[in-house]
C-alpha cells in the first residue's frame, strides 16, 4: 500500500516525521483528508488537531497556524507551533483558556486584540481536547 512521508516542523524543531497512510489536517476552509497520490496543494492552516494514521494507529498533534504543502508522496507542515498529544501541558492549557475567556468577557476589547484573544481561546480548547482524547485512549 502506498504511503505518504509526513514532516511537521516549526521554527524551533522537527515535531513529527513518519511514513503514514493518511493525514487529516485543519485547513482554513475546513478539515481535509490527504491520501497518497493526492494532487499538489498548498494551503494555510488554522489552529486544530492534525491526525496521522499508520495502519490501525492514530497519532494526534495540535498545530497552530502555518502552511501545509501536499505533493503526491509527501506532506510538509510548516507550523507556527505544533506539539504531540503527549507533550501538552494540561495545567498550562487550562490557564490559557481561563485567561482568554476572561479577556473575551471584557466588552471593550479592541478589534485586533479580540481576534488574538479568540485565537488563543481556540488553541487552548484544541490542546485540551487532544490531551483529553489521549488520556481516554493512550494509544493516540
Swiss-Prot record:
Q: Which UniProt keywords apply?
A: ATP synthesis, Cell membrane, CF(1), Hydrogen ion transport, Ion transport, Membrane, Transport
**Localization per Swiss-Prot or TrEMBL:** Cell membrane
Please give the CDD domains that the UniProt record associates with this protein.
F1-ATPase_delta (cd12152)
Q: Which GO terms describe its cellular component?
A: plasma membrane; proton-transporting ATP synthase complex
Report how it sits in the membrane.
Answer: Peripheral membrane protein
Q: Write one Gene Ontology MF term.
A: ATP binding
InterPro entries per the UniProt record, alphabetical: ATP_F1_dsu/esu_C_sf, ATP_synth_F1_dsu/esu, ATP_synth_F1_dsu/esu_N, ATP_synth_F1_esu_C, ATPsynth_dsu/esu_N
Asked whether the keyword Zinc-finger is assigned, the reply is no
Q: Which stretches are annotated as coiled coil?
A: none
Record Pfam families: ATP-synt_DE, ATP-synt_DE_N
Q: Quote the subunit structure annotation.
A: F-type ATPases have 2 components, CF(1) - the catalytic core - and CF(0) - the membrane proton channel. CF(1) has five subunits: alpha(3), beta(3), gamma(1), delta(1), epsilon(1). CF(0) has three main subunits: a, b and c.
Q: Which NCBIfam families match?
A: ATP_synt_epsi (TIGR01216), PRK13446.1 (NF009980)
User: Belongs to which family?
Assistant: Belongs to the ATPase epsilon chain family.
**Function noted in UniProt:** Produces ATP from ADP in the presence of a proton gradient across the membrane.
Protein name as it appears in the record:
ATP synthase epsilon chain
Look up and give the organism this protein is from. Answer: Dehalococcoides mccartyi (strain ATCC BAA-2100 / JCM 16839 / KCTC 5957 / BAV1)
Amino acid at each position: 500500500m502506498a504511503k505518504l512521508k509526513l514532516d511537521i516542523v516549526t521554527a524551533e524543531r522537527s515535531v513529527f516525521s513518519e511514513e503514514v497512510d493518511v493525514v487529516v489536517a485543519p485547513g482554513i476552509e475546513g478539515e481535509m483528508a490527504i491520501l497518497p497520490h493526492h494532487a499538489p496543494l498548498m494551503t494555510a492552516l488554522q489552529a486544530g488537531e492534525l491526525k496521522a494514521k499508520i495502519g490501525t494507529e492514530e497519532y494526534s498533534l495540535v498545530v497552530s497556524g502555518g502552511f501545509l504543502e501536499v505533493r503526491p508522496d509527501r506532506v510538509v507542515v510548516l507550523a507556527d507551533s505544533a506539539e504531540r498529544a503527549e507533550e501538552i501541558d494540561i495545567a498550562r492549557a487550562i490557564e490559557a483558556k481561563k485567561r482568554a475567556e476572561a479577556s473575551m468577557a471584557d466588552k471593550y476589547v479592541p478589534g485586533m486584540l479580540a481576534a488574538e484573544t479568540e485565537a488563543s481561546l481556540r488553541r487552548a480548547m484544541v490542546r485540551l481536547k487532544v490531551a483529553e482524547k489521549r488520556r481516554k485512549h493512550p494509544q493516540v
